[in-house]
């Protein structure tokens, strides 16, 4: 089952070893020196490849570990100790220092980590200068003895040792890459969130990578000292650190021989261009830019991706059901998951409160409503509850996500979190480690590989398993993520929107799979917007409203519950001010949407939608979460490109226009979640709305008009918008949209998260805008609320318009509730 890359590795290393040994005995003394420097640079490159290629960290301070290795080796050999003892001592010391540096440094990532490693290199450099009694200060260490063995030429001996070290480093990397350690590092690199949900502690993986990288660099440095016979702090310039990183990136990070190719470049190019030494960094900088432009994965990385294609390996047509059942039912948590009165606040917002649930083994539970993903994040350890208990055999509340995963909870995500550079099979195999690294070179057994293939077949994946997961289609990504979660052998499986973007046929297959998993004894907790799926497979539903449970029951009980219907459609307490007079505007459509199709994955989220908005109308788009309402508004505003169909604004096509151009033409979006600029004042937030206009703006007069419309904002006009309440921020967002003087104001979920009082004030303002002749297109989860102010409405279900008509007609339509809660519902 080994792919071509795996088979080529050991053979290629052997060929390189043989070629290098021949070269050692064939080269003259100067060429031999250059060859040895290339070998040592390759070892450093392999070390950095562990850090960059496997764990995704960056270090511009590896010259410090190179120097540490060189000085320790020099001091030991000058003290009369043999080189064979000095080399491992130098490597171990560098590795230990690397681990100590990594533990605090890896609390940060990206550019911050790079800055810490740069600072470390300067600390080491100045320590070498100031610690004169040991390091010789600026004068350095001289007379470093050459190694001796059987009367061999010391230069040849050093070259052979450097070659052996390079070959050993390559063999080490090749074994590490395919081991449990390597899989864990690559998983953390691709997605720390997903890695934690499989039981991996990212700090441990990254610390090990840093330590191994520093160890290899220290080993290389230990041979530099006898090679040069003299070292001082200037032997280790900071610019060399940059060149080491460049060698890995240009050669191809994550590839076996990329660092070797990169080492040849950074050592040989200066030799070939010795007359232009002062331009060395400039030349390498240009080289880096050219390579990344032509080959963004590095030279060897691009070659491997384009020309080395493994023979496709697919899951078996027949599944060993007994093996899968034994594996998935092999947990001890027969009493299931207990959640008691959990809650959490974010700032001043109570996101969830008093949530309790018992999910027995072998059951499918469907939390739904506002706050469901927050509850999922608390169960899986990504959020720590402020109150309450979570138990699965033992208390879990407050444990980090990786410990929660090891306790028997696995999950998927709304947006798939696969390890993109890893193969489909490795994505599943890494989950079987259950967060444990094992021995350094341990590999997946044949039995594990066969089980992984069975799990992929179980979920319905039929594609190649030895291709990168990032190349998968959307539906296959969903299936592989579920298979990966199952590979962790959880007692509880949390599924967050698993049907998003799936076709109806794929969704039906998912329903069958979920029932099969429950039959294996798994507890399945399903968060899903597809209410037909939820109602079909769930044994019980927990319905949340603003993070607070309102009912628990069977699907049939939930569908009949008046509190649920009110939560999904909106209550009827609010009474909007009726229109001053019935709408009697022009029938020349201001906005026309024809056969609109919007794709995010394998299946369209909006399919052949047609709608019309006339001048002066308030039109609402209604439907359950995930029906496609917000996707339509984002597409109209130019934030997402339609797959097909047309959008006409005043009879001009705008479906291919940019978001800024569409705003300039007269469509202003008030986005979901308000999205004010928190550090700007209310006044500045409002002014930003007028920037798309092409006429002269009388800012003071127009802001005064906004303040008259929303009197609450007057006393807060100079306050940072981030300090306002949610309702006040929504008023700022609406005011910002009005400052654009739009032809149509698009409003996306304006009532979301607001108190009843604030909703009333906001909707009174929308009714006033309607009566003034402002054209509005409104999306709101609260159907009854939207129908209070709308003239007409369209009802969406799974991306299709299933009903349209006047607001009065739809308020009396019993089928409206079915669009939100599934079939068989009556309001």
Regions found by a protein language model. Name each.
Residues 389-406, 646-664, 807:
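ABC ATPase NBD Q-loop/coupling interface
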Residues 493-497, 745-748:
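Catalytic Walker B motif of ABC-type/P-loop ATPase nucleotide-binding domains
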Residues 2-318:
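Transmembrane alpha-helices and adjacent helix-loop boundaries
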Residues 486, 737-738:
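ABC ATPase C-loop
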Residues 489, 741:
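Conserved catalytic motifs of ABC-family nucleotide-binding domains
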Residues 380, 637:
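Helix-to-loop junction immediately C-terminal to a conserved catalytic motif
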Residues 365-367, 622-624:
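The feature captures the beta-strand-to-loop junction immediately N-terminal to the Walker
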Residues 534-536, 786-788:
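A short, surface-exposed alpha-helical micro-motif characterized by mixed small hydrophobic
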């Amino acid at each position: 089952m080994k792919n071509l890359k795996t088979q080529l590795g050991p053979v290629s290393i052997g060929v390189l070893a043989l070629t290098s040994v021949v070269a050692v005995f064939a080269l003259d003394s100067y060429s031999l020196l250059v060859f040895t420097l290339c070998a040592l640079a390759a070892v450093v490159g392999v070390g950095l490849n562990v850090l960059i290629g496997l764990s995704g960290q960056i270090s511009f301070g590896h010259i410090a570990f190179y120097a540490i290795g060189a000085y320790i080796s020099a001091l030991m050999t000058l003290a009369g100790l043999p080189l064979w003892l000095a080399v491992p001592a130098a490597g171990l010391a560098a590795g230990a220092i690397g681990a100590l540096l990594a533990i605090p440094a890896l609390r940060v990532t990206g550019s911050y980590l790079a800055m810490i490693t740069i600072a470390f290199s300067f600390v080491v450099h100045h320590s070498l200068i100031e610690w004169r009694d040991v390091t010789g200060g600026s004068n350095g260490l001289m007379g470093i003895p050459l190694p001796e063995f059987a009367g061999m030429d010391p230069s040849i001996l050093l070259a052979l040792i450097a070659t052996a070290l390079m070959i050993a480093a390559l063999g080490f990397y090749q074994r590490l890459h395919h081991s449990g350690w390597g899989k864990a590092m690559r998983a953390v690199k691709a997605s720390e969130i997903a890695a934690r949900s499989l039981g991996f502690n990212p700090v441990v993986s990254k610390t090990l990578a840093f330590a191994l990288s520093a160890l290899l660099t220290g080993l290389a440095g230990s041979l530099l000292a006898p090679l040069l016979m003299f070292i001082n702090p200037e032997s280790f310039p900071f610019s060399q650190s940059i060149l080491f990183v460049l060698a890995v990136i240009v050669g191809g990070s994550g590839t076996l021989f990329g660092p070797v190719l990169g080492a040849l470049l950074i050592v040989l190019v200066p030799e070939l261009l010795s007359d232009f030494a002062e331009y060395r960094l400039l030349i390498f900088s240009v080289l880096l830019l050219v390579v990344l432009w032509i080959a963004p994965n590095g030279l060897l990385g691009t070659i491997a991706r384009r020309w080395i294609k493994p023979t496709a390996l697919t899951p078996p047509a027949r599944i060993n059901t007994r093996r899968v059942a034994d594996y998935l039912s092999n947990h001890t948590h027969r009493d299931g998951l207990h959640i008691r009165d959990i809650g959490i606040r974010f700032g001043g917002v109570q996101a969830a409160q008093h949530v309790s649930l018992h999910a027995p083994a072998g059951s499918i539970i469907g939390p739904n409503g506002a706050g469901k993903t927050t509850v999922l994040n608390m169960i899986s350890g990504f959020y720590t509850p402020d109150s309450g208990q979570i138990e699965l055999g033992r208390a879990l509340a407050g444990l980090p996500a990786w410990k929660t995963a090891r306790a028997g909870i696995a999950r998927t995500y709304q947006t798939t979190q696969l390890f993109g550079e890893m193969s489909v099979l490795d994505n599943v195999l890494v989950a079987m480690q259950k967060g444990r690294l094992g021995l350094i070179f341990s590999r997946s057994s044949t039995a594990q590989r066969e089980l992984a293939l069975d799990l992929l077949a179980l979920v319905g994946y039929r594609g190649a398993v030895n291709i990168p997961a990032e190349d998968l289609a959307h539906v296959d990504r969903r299936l592989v993520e579920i298979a990966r979660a199952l590979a962790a052998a959880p007692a509880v499986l949390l599924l967050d929107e698993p049907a998003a973007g799936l076709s109806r046929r794929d969704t039906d297959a998912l329903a069958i799979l979920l029932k099969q998993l429950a039959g294996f004894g798994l507890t399945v907790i399903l968060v899903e917007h597809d209410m037909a799926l939820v109602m079909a497979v769930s044994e019980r539903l927990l319905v949340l409203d603003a993070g607070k449970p309102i009912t628990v029951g069977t699907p049939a009980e939930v569908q009949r519950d008046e509190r649920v219907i009110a939560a999904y459609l909106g209550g009827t307490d609010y009474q909007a001010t009726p229109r001053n007079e019935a709408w009697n505007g022009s029938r020349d459509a201001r906005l026309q949407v024809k056969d609109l199709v919007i794709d995010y994955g394998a299946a369209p989220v909006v399919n052949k939608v047609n709608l019309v908005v006339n001048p002066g109308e308030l039109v609402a788009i209604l439907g359950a979460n995930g029906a496609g309402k917000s996707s339509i508004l984002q597409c109209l505003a130019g934030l997402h490109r339609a797959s097909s169909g047309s959008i006409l604004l005043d009879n001009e096509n705008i479906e291919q226009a940019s978001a800024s151009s569409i705003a300039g033409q007269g469509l202003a979006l008030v986005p979901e979640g308000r999205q004010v600029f928190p550090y700007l004042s209310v006044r500045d937030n409002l002014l930003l709305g007028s920037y798309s206009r092409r006429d002269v703006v009388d800012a003071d007069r127009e802001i005064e008009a906004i303040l008259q419309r929303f009197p609450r904002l007057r006393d807060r006009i100079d306050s940072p918008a981030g300090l306002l309440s949610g309702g006040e921020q929504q008023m700022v967002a609406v005011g910002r949209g009005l400052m654009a003087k739009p032809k149509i104001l698009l409003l996306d979920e304006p009532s979301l998260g607001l108190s009843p009082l604030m909703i009333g004030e906001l909707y009174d303002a929308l009714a006033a805008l309607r009566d003034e002749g402002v054209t509005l297109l409104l999306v709101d989860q609260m159907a009854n609320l939207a129908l209070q102010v709308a003239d007409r409405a369209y009802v969406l279900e799974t991306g299709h318009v299933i009903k349209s008509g006047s607001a009065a007609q739809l308020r009396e339509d019993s089928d409206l509730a079915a669009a939100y809660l599934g079939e068989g519902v009556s309001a």
